[in-house]
Structure formats: C-alpha cells, structure tokens
Amino acid sequence: MDRIKKLSLSILILLSSSLFAQVWTPLHKWQDSPIEWEEKFQKWVESEQVHREMFTKEDSPYKDIYTDCADFIYALRIIFSYENSLPFKALVPGTKYSKIKKYYSQSSKRWNHLDETSRVRSFILHVIDNLGTDHLAHNDSYPIKLADIKSGDIFMIKFTPEGKETQTKHSQVIKSISEIGLFDVIYGTRNTVLEKKNLYHVKQRKFSDNLAPFINHQGFKRFKQPWQYEATVTDLPSYSQEQYKRTNEHQGEGFFKYVQALHKKKDETVEQGAKRFFTSLCESFQERAKFVDSALKYLEKINHRCMNYSEYDTHSTPMRDGQIKALISDAQIFKEVRQPNNEENSYSQLINILFSENSGALEKETIQKACLIKVSENYSFDLVEVKDLLLSGLLSSNPNDKIEYRWGIKNSHLKTKCPEF
C-alpha cells in the first residue's frame, strides 16, 4: 500500500510540474555579480554559435524558425537567455502606459503541455509573431554611446528612399567590429522568411550617411535587460543621446566616418581598401541578382498580378540599390584620395579599371574574370557595366517589372503598369 501511495505521489508531482511548467526556469539574473552577462551575450554573438544557418541547419534545435530583421533580434535574445538560464522580458504591445504593464516572459505557462525544447520554440514563434521593428525601437531597446558600441548591439534604420513616399524600416545585429572600425552585421529580412533562407552576414559594412540617425528610435541601440524596464532609461548602462545630437548638427554628413574612427585600431593599406570596396560591390550586385530572381519567381507564383503593399515592400530593392550607389560613391572617393597603383593582378588595378573612362578590351577581360554578375540564363554583366547602369538610373527597384527592366536593358515597354508604393 505504501508503495502504491509513493508511486501515486510521484505521478502527481510529475503531472503538477508539467501542468504548471514555465517556458524555462531561470537560475541566474542579468545583474548578477561578478558575472557580466551582457558581456557574455556580446561574446556569444561574436562567436561561431551565431551564424547564417542558425535556423536552417538540420541539427539546430531552432531549425525552421524563420526570422525577419526584428524577429531575429528577439529570437537571439530569447535563445541566449534560455541557454544560460536567464530571464527574458519584452513589453506586450499597448501596455506601455497602462497601470499594470504586461510582458512576454519565460514565466508563461501557455505551453505547459509541451517538453522544454518545444516550449522554447513555441515561445520564440509567439513573440516574433506579435512584435516588430517599431516595437523594438520604442519599447525594448535604448540608445547608447557611440564609443561603447559592442557585438550584440543593434543598428536600426528608418528612412525614405529617393523618389519614394513610404519609409523603409530595418534592423541589423552587430556581430563584430573589425580592426579598421567597420561592422560585420547579421540580419534577417522578410525574404528570408518567405523563401526560408539563411540569414544575411555582411562583413565590414560601412553605412551611407543617409542612414545616420536623426531621432531617438533609430541608430545604435541595446536590448533592455528584464530589470531595466523598471529603471529610468537615462540611468541605464551606456545610455546616450549623442548620436542624434551629432547627426542633427552635421545633417548626417560624416557620421559613420566618425563612428569608424572611434572604433578603429589600425589603418588599412591601399590594397586592403581596394579589396574591401571591390569585393563588397561585387557581392552586393550578386546578392541583388538573387533577390531580383526571387521576386521574379514570386511574380510567376501569383500569375503576374500586381503585388500588394506588403508583397511590394518584401520584394522591392530601393534600399539595397541606394546602399550600392553609396558604396560606389565611397569607392570612387577612395580611388581619388588614396590613388591605388596599377600593379597587375591586384585589387588596386581592379578599382582603377572600375572607374576608368578609357578601358579597352584587355581591361574588360580583367574585370569580367574578377567579377561577373549572372542575372539569368540570357544576361550577364561585368561590374563596370552594372555600375554604370545603376548610376544612370536604369535599374528598376520595382518588383513588378520584368527582368529586362530590373537590370536596365532598354525596353521601356517592359515597364509594369502596376502601382508603386
């Protein structure tokens, strides 16, 4: 009889713990001393544990959790909190000014019928389904000192592309900072969600000055720790409004050059600079080719009807094209200021050819070998050709356009009559 009672009690305890299970039970606090958990988070983001295939690799416990830009940031913070037995908190929309604020947290018992791994996955999906870029900017992050930017911090973008009326919003995670003061960034997009693709990882990114932060909800920010929701924001570690003051005083001009100087440990050589610019431009156009191809396939899927606002926003390329144009401008300034030599088989030679007004057949062959952008079975461009097309305003960012118009092949009748957003 005693054995039956003990067995019954054990079953009851087991059932009770399952019935009232939190997503996970934290054993630590972010503000624990002497452990610096924020510093550990920064090192974790910089490590190989955070990578492009976090949500696509077969052996990942988080496989098939596809994230756009803000989703990725929330997912990162949840994963680190769970794996290190820390609490997680994010404000529930619409409760910021309520008498009783509500939060998404690991204490939720919504998924107590699931095992722990499944609870964590469900929690991530629930949070990213309900929160986005604006919410992250206004509620779950705060602006920081420019000199204190670290791995794991966020760069938030809000701007109106040239010729457009609708604002573009985006956020990226700083994965690491190079010795020359440029950022490696990792991020998701709506396209990574729709296409179930890997995250983007861009190395040594230098942002263009039109993305300089003018208002409090843009720029370089840090995710709030759970206890910080109850604190005065101005008292938070590294809190600062300096980036907005600097941007407004100088109208954004030279902002990112200033940020780079704060974090630079050494100067790059002329050849290193030439390699960085040439490689970045080549990769940017090749990435654009993949993105345009994805939009064209989506057009086929929807039988070539006009895309609605959401679809248009997902598949258009105004921000991408603007960033490439700014990169071209920076590369040209680099060539004029640093004056790279023409040594054969060097990146310096390639940069000179890229901006030469008198290139011949030999130079064309050299640039084609170094970087060819294949946009379809029928069309390919070398880097000089596609650079000139973009600067001439012939590349279309409209995802409803046919491939010939997307890439500046002069057939104006191919331009869509669908509305632009």
Residue ranges and their predicted role:
Residues 117-183:
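...with weaker cross-activation on analogous glycine-rich loops/strands in unrelated enzymes
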